[in-house]
Amino acid sequence: MKKEEKRSTYIFNAFYDLLIDNYRQQHEIGWYAEKLCLTPKYFSGVIRQITGKSAAQWINEILILHAKRLLYTRFDMNVQQIAYELGFKGSANFCRFFKDQTGLRPSEYRKGQTT
């Protein structure tokens, strides 16, 4: 493996570790780039080059995965509580994000999982 490939792999692995630990609070690419001491542009380019997906796609996919898990398993939590658990400022922002990503409102997704 070439030096640049090793560096890119290291950057992705460090990003993924940060993402798993911080996805609830941090949704911005700039935050992850700063933690890795990289410019957002360079950071985004490395992530896309090594994975074929943008850093934003990775962040969104992790958020959606965990949102679906909470909607499916935590019936004691309403949509607003799930929104706050995932770091959204309000349920409207979360609902818009969820629908943009999945095509369904969170309540529709939850209802579809229980029928």
Language model segments and positions:
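…primarily DNA-binding HTH/wHTH and HhH modules…
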Residues: 96-115
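Core residues of bacterial helix-turn-helix
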Residues: 36, 86-87, 98
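Terminal helix-turn-helix DNA-binding modules in bacterial transcription factors
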Residues: 50-89, 111-115
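Residues within helix-turn-helix
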Residues: 30, 41, 77-81, 91-92
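An amphipathic alpha-helical interaction segment
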Residues: 1-2, 38
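N-terminal positioning helix adjacent to the helix-turn-helix/winged-helix DNA-binding module
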Residues: 4-15, 51, 59-63
